[in-house]
Structure formats: structure tokens, C-alpha cells
Amino acid sequence: MYDIQKIREDFPILDREVYGKPLIYLDNGATTQKPRQVVEAITDEYYSVNANVHRGVHFLSQQATELHEASRETVRRFINARSSNEIVFTRGTTESINLLASSFADSQMKEGDEVIVSVMEHHSNIVPWQLQAARKGIVLKVIPMNDRGELLLDEYEKLFSERTKLVSFAHVSNVLGTVNPAKEMIATAHAHGVPVLIDGAQSVPHMKVDVQDLDADFFAFSGHKIYGPTGVGVLYGKEEWLDKLPPYQGGGEMIQSVSFEKTTFNELPFKFEAGTPDYIGTTALAKALDYVSALGVENIATHEHELTQYAMQRLKEIDGMRIFGEAGNKSSVISFLVGNIHHLDMGTLLDRLGIAVRTGHHCAQPLMIRMGIEGTVRASFGLYNTKEEIDVLAAGIERVSRMF
């Protein structure tokens, strides 16, 4: 049984008030709240096991190393990677994509080679490739979408050429909630001999992800969007790909030997993890994944699907409501505008009612240009949200609308 009240008790922040109103937190697409189990894991490790990992023979260092590497194994199991060598710890999805963009472009691309992305990408899956375009002369090609927010797969197929070296797209749009057909799109790319990077920041918290079933070559996600801490993320890569890519940064831990004449690099995954890792953060990430696993990813997905369907129904009843993104397969994100009310005004006034939503372009300006708007209000749901909170949101939107 999915006991929502018991779940909410694990998140003390949900009991607080904002401007004298109960907090209604609907900004989970930006970051999720943290259960007490995750916060306690952080404090417990600082209080009792704090020591640098991989670098000491003393007991604390060995214990911290065991926790850190056990966390890597937890991530491996959670996304069903073949080996923990395929799990690279990063600061988040953004760094994961930048790591791959740099290493892949350096070793696998030359001027005129192409990367395919989609029109609905977050800036973190556009700008890193533009930096490589400026540095190496690679070409960015863009998958278009229809007005429902669904990628046009026929057009996607036409983008491939003999110069296409990589496809990189969001599993789930952070603006539209569209769940892209990743497995099908990966198969298409592989038919052309092209590897694929999936931005999984918005999918991992909301659905079961199996990187082997997807056959993804690379997959990136962030801890803080799946009830873990900020500052820690993951880049999964097939071992055969990670083996052939050069390091992204240099420093301690990623080396095997160093002289002034030559440096040789460490084995996987450590050659991509220069410097002291966020070993406290990785332990907390593992605790967050354990928390999600205990609730059941499928149970969470069912709960959030019901919430999203209910929210779509309630919001469509509001006069002047425009919802952006009505794909047949949609995750728990709803972006909207009401009448001529500016998204910043709507978000600010909802905040005064205790309702936390996101406003603006959501780091997806090319998508906003495609839709002919400058920004939206975005409500995004998590495992602890309720239908009663959706009712408060709908009532709040109606109240704000009457002010204009």
C-alpha cells in the first residue's frame, strides 16, 4: 500500500508554513525535498566515518572507502548497469554531459562531424555541444517536435548522415513532461552505428530505468532530483566506450603513475574522477535510491501518473488555461499560462499562497522560441504530493486570475 501520509512524515520540510500558509511544494522538477533518512546519512557519516577515500591505510579511510564504493554498487543496481566500473560519479547531470562532450569530441570527432539533439533539450544538453562546435567545428542538428510536444521520429531518422557521431537527448522533457521513446530512438541510432547519450535527470526519479534494456551507451542523472543531496550525480557509460575515452580532468586519484615526462591513467571508473570525490554525497545518494526502491519505483510512477492526470483535468477547467505539452506519454510536469497573466506574476502570487512553482524559461530557451512564448509556470510533482495539494493549486490559480 502506498501510504502517502506516512511518506510525508519522512519529509519534515513539508510541515512548514510560507507566509502563514501550509507549504505546497510543486517544484520537484528543479529539486526534490530530502527524507530524514538521507539527511541523517549525511550527518552520521560526518560524525563517525569522515575520512578521505581510496588514500589511506587507517581504519576511517578504509571504512569511508567501503561506503563510497558500496554506493557505486547501489547506483549500478538501481539502473541495472552491468558493472560498477560503468558508474562515474560527477557533480550532477550538467557535469556528466560536459564530461562526455569534452572527452567524446576530443577523441571521436573532427570538424564537420555531427551531434543530434532535440528541440526540447535543457541548456545543459545544448551549450556543451556548442562549446565543442566553437572549439572543433562540429555541427549540431536538431530533432523537431509537433504541437503536442512529441518528437517527430520520421524527421529524426532523416537527420543521420555519415558524419553523425552521437545522439544526445532528454529521456523526459523538464518543460513539457514528454516521455521520449528512448528505446526506439536508441535502436534507430544504433542502426546507423551511432552511440547515444540519454539525459535522465527527469526520468530516474519518476520511472524505472534499465540502461541495459534501453541499450543506452551513456546515461546521466543528478542526485538532488531523486531525493538525494546536491553536488552529486552519475554518468553511466558502457565499459567499452569509457575505456576508449580520455580523461576529462587531471589530478589526484585519476592517475596510475606520474613523472615530469609522462602520466598514465587509472582504471575505470577512477580515470574520470579527479580529486577528492563527494564521498558523503555518494553515501547520501545511495540512501535516497534505497528509499525510492523501498517504496517501489512502479508504485511511485503509478501515484504520480494519477496525480498528473488529476492535475491536467483540474487545470483545464480554469478559464484561459493554456497547457504546454500534451504528449500521449507524459510524466509529472505541467507547464501552463493563464490568459494574459505573466508567468512571473502568477508564480509570485501563488507563492504568497504558499504554493511553490517554477517560472521562466526553465533553461530551455530554444523550446520557448519553438512555442512562441518567453516562459511558463511549471508545476512538477514528486512522490509525496497529493490530490489535495492539486486542489489548492487550482484554487490558487483561479484566485490569482480574478485579480487581473
Summary of predicted features, one role per range:
Residues M1-F404:
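Pyridoxal 5′-phosphate
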